[in-house]
Amino acid sequence: MDAWPRCLERLEAEFPPEDVHTWLKPLQAEDRGDSIVLYAPNAFIVEQVRERYLPRIRELLAYFAGNGEVALAVGSRPRAPEPLPAPQAVASAPAAAPIVPFAGNLDSHYTFANFVEGRSNQLGLAAAIQAAQKPGDRAHNPLLLYGSTGLGKTHLMFAAGNALRQANPAAKVMYLRSEQFFSAMIRALHDKAMDQFKRQFHQIDALLIDDIQFFAGMDRTQEEFFHTFNALFDGRQHIILTCDRYPREVEGLEPRLKSRLAWGLSVAIDPPDFETRAAIVLAKARERGAEIPDDVAFLIAKKMRSNVRDLEGALNTLVARANFTGRSITVEFAQETLRDLLRAQQQAIGIPNIQKTVADYYGLQMKDLLSKRRTRSLARPRQVAMALAKELTEHSLPEIGDAFAGRDHTTVLHACRQIRTLMEADGKLREDWEKLIRKLSE
């Protein structure tokens, strides 16, 4: 196809030559009409492309070919084009082509079995399992998973969809990104086929939509989604959604839609703690058949605090360089390989950023947060900021104390212990902590 060479030419201008040579040039493209399949010689390249380049590839192919629906597969491009497979997620009218294109097939790689559980995602995992086991149950319909990018929301959504299909292979499970819902609706409006559009959605057993925050400000899209939601909910078909924040915090979402989203169960997915991050690194390494010493996993987990995607990116970089150079993966090798990545991560979450974020969150002036005043309205946010600095940076206690108007390191230590103790009993403080972690990890 002509579009792929043009896409590759643009990618060569945007990414380092060694990356293009290693991950992108081995790909072979096949145009299937409603989708484009990129074939890679092995699963490792598929994973690299999915994690690092797929969003940009979709954008470029949408521009050059008018088609941004891309699937990745292991193998070689068939000599003769294969017929487009029937959409697994769409129930179409017998005599009409589906309005919703071949998009959103569930990725079978993502299951509950390979999801790494931790304190930050326990409730989300339990809720997704319940949704898969009891589809349509009003206690968790809709199920809304919210949190920053790269924390595992889509993994849980795919896992629930795959579990639904495993329990009932005939189940019509549709997964779409929010922009795909929008595009399908626009196409239906253009083709004067809104009845068919509605019929397709109303006939499915479960609807999974990613990133509903992008519906904000799209009045007609929200109206159609509102009616689709009502029809599915009334029919006891399950709805699973993700959002990058709690929906009531999304400006531009209609109040009636926010109200509907609150009918079921909303669960926050928070950044993983150190133990979970280390477990994720080790689990992802095993998936790739790579030998990663525990101390290397601990190093990555300690330095990369923001999200799972960054952990995987660091691991992929490490494994790829080890394969290219033939060197063993050691702590020294990891520090050398990830030096720039770790430095950027450290700079992104610095003490000044933490102080400003905490001050803004509690509605304080920076000078008050750093002052010597000990009123409760100032002391508690100040302790939270100190504890976050200890949690999210590599600074020592004395360095943190210096950044807080020259306080003693024992004051910082007391603040850290105090906040940890209070969070066990104070749900509001725990919620504040988790929200601040999410803000600082974005």
Swiss-Prot record:
This is Chromosomal replication initiator protein DnaA. Residues 323-442 are annotated as: Domain IV, binds dsDNA. One of its GO terms (cellular component) is plasma membrane. Residues 105-322 are annotated as: Domain III, AAA+ region. Plays an essential role in the initiation and regulation of chromosomal replication. ATP-DnaA binds to the origin of replication (oriC) to initiate formation of the DNA replication initiation complex once per cell cycle. Binds the DnaA box (a 9 base pair repeat at the origin) and separates the double-stranded (ds)DNA. Forms a right-handed helical filament on oriC DNA; dsDNA binds to the exterior of the filament while single-stranded (ss)DNA is stabiized in the filament's interior. It holds the Pfam family Bac_DnaA_C. GO terms for biological process: DNA replication initiation; regulation of DNA replication. Residues 1-75 are annotated as: Domain I, interacts with DnaA modulators. SUPFAM superfamilies: P-loop containing nucleoside triphosphate hydrolases, TrpR-like. Belongs to the DnaA family. Oligomerizes as a right-handed, spiral filament on DNA at oriC. It is found in: Cytoplasm. One of its GO terms (molecular function) is ATP binding. ATP binds at G150, G152, K153, T154. Domain I is involved in oligomerization and binding regulators, domain II is flexibile and of varying length in different bacteria, domain III forms the AAA+ region, while domain IV binds dsDNA. Keywords: ATP-binding, Cytoplasm, DNA replication, DNA-binding, Lipid-binding, Nucleotide-binding. Residues 75-104 are annotated as: Domain II.
